[in-house]
């Protein structure tokens, strides 16, 4: 008798399932968050105020994702009527303060805004400027990191303790029911999470089983969100790639947020560039012998969220679509329209690299590079797809 085919366990990702995921800009007050938001979104908010809580309700904007592949496809399908790039939704969340987890400084409202996003850009101030006050009195990025980390952890401990109390109530009923057994397992996991948080660690940086991830996702923990640390330098320090605080920041992140990325950038430089035409901005960067950090900041967050792209190309439109890694063809079709998912028949798939080489759909087909895939096909980053569906919907 042949051995049973092993069913591969589907990996469950931390966070909210879906393709339209959101990144929140987080940090203490007056570290450059709102100016960064204006630069990355090119959305003017007026002059960001030089005092805490200048932003109260989060601002939202969609950021175009830099994509050389999309640009190249638009050149190849240059007669297309419409070009639609991929976007990342970004929120500018008001500055946190020490004591936010206890409700100080409008803390509960701000923490609820963080809870509603899927990932975090944490902006850390590393520049000196006497005209921009620091809520803690002086510039000390490691202290600022510890404040934010502590406030998010304390709130998560509060969430976890409430979840533990709820699980305990059911577990105390006793008996051998499946629900009681599950709640006892949840209690063990939640106790483990609380100990982890009390040690200064973030939930996102720990290794969890798929079963544990499902429970963690139901708790909507703040520290379970992927985080990128944006180190806001002066223009001079960014260009020369030096700052006295960088080593200490790296040591702190390695210890308390291992595996998370640190990206140095300069809000003042990016803000200046945002007011220029693309040509003038390119000329300015050449003159300064540096590059903008924004493309890396945007694309790296998409990677942290496990987001990938597929494309649809034709005479009417070239479009880059965003999906979660591991998405199957019918669900990818559903991103375009629900009817395409419900009546899915097959997907005709080409690879970007083949389109770049052959530059013509008929030549790709003649070369045997056009593949037909069924409902179990897992879409790969860079696929160009023509979906075929029933009921006359293509």
Swiss-Prot record:
NCBIfam families: redox-regulated ATPase YchF (TIGR00092)
Misc remark: Present with 36803 molecules/cell in log phase SD medium.
GO molecular function ontology, one term from the record: ribosomal large subunit binding
Domain (TGS) ranges: 306-389
Similarity-based family: Belongs to the TRAFAC class OBG-HflX-like GTPase superfamily. OBG GTPase family. YchF/OLA1 subfamily.
Subcellular location: Cytoplasm
Protein source organism: Saccharomyces cerevisiae (strain ATCC 204508 / S288c) (Baker's yeast)
Subunit architecture: Monomer. Interacts with the 26S proteasome subunit RPT6.
Modified residue annotations for Phosphoserine: 116, 119
Cofactors, names only: Mg(2+)
Binding site for ATP: 30-35, 233
Ligand binding (Mg(2+)): 34, 55
GO CC aspect terms: cytoplasm; cytoplasmic stress granule
Segments forming domain OBG-type G: 21-285
InterPro entries cross-referenced by the UniProt entry: ATPase_YchF/OLA1 (IPR004396), Beta-grasp_dom_sf (IPR012675), G_OBG (IPR031167), GTP-bd (IPR006073), P-loop_NTPase (IPR027417), TGS (IPR004095), TGS-like (IPR012676), TGS-like_dom_sf (IPR023192)
Name the record gives this protein: Obg-like ATPase 1
Residue numbers carrying Phosphothreonine: 89
Covalent cross-link site, Glycyl lysine isopeptide (Lys-Gly) (interchain with G-Cter in ubiquitin): 98
Pfam families: MMR_HSR1, YchF-GTPase_C
BP GO terms, sorted: positive regulation of cellular response to heat
Role: Hydrolyzes ATP, and can also hydrolyze GTP with lower efficiency. Has lower affinity for GTP.
Keywords carried by this UniProt record: ATP-binding, Cytoplasm, Hydrolase, Isopeptide bond, Magnesium, Metal-binding, Nucleotide-binding, Phosphoprotein, Ubl conjugation
Expression induction: By hydrogen peroxide and during DNA replication stress.
CDD domains named among the record's database cross-references: TGS_YchF_OLA1 (cd04867), YchF (cd01900)
């Amino acid at each position: 008798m042949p051995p049973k085919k092993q069913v591969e366990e589907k990996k469950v990702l931390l966070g909210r399932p879906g393709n339209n995921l959101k990144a929140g800009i987080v940090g203490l007050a007056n570290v450059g968050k709102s100016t960064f938001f204006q630069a990355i979104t090119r959305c003017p908010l007026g002059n960001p105020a030089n005092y805490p809580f200048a932003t109260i309700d989060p601002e939202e904007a969609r950021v175009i994702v830099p994509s050389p592949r999309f640009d190249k496809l638009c050149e190849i399908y240059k007669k297309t009527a419409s070009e639609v790039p991929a976007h990342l939704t970004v929120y500018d969340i008001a500055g946190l303060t020490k004591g936010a987890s206890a409700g100080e400084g409008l803390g509960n409202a701000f923490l609820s805004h963080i809870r509603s996003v899927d990932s975090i850009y944490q902006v850390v101030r590393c520049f000196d400027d006497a005209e921009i006050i620091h809520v803690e009195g002086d510039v000390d990025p490691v202290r600022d990191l510890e404040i934010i980390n502590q406030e998010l952890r304390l709130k998560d401990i509060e969430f976890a303790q409430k979840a533990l109390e709820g699980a305990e109530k059911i577990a105390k009923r006793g008996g051998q029911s499946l629900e009681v057994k599950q709640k006892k397992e949840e209690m063990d996991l939640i106790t483990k999470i609380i100990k982890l948080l009390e040690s200064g660690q973030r939930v996102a940086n720990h290794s969890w089983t798929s079963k544990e991830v499902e429970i963690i996702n139901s708790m909507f923990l703040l520290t379970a969100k992927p985080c990128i640390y944006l180190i806001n330098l002066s223009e001079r320090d960014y260009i020369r790639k030096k700052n006295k605080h960088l080593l200490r920041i790296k040591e702190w992140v390695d210890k308390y947020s291992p595996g998370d990325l640190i990206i140095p950038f300069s809000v003042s430089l990016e803000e200046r560039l945002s007011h220029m035409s693309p040509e003038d901005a390119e000329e300015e960067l050449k003159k300064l012998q540096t590059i903008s950090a924004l493309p890396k900041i945007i694309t790296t967050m998409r990677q942290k969220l496990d987001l990938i792209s597929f494309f649809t190309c034709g005479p009417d439109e070239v479009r880059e679509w965003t999906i979660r890694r591991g998405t199957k063809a019918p669900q990818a079709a559903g991103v375009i329209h629900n009817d395409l998912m419900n009546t899915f028949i097959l997907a005709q798939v080409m690879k970007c690299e083949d389109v770049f080489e052959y530059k013509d759909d008929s030549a790709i087909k003649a070369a045997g590079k056009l593949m037909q895939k069924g409902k179990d096909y897992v879409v790969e980053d860079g696929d160009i797809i023509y979906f075929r569906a029933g009921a006359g919907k293509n």
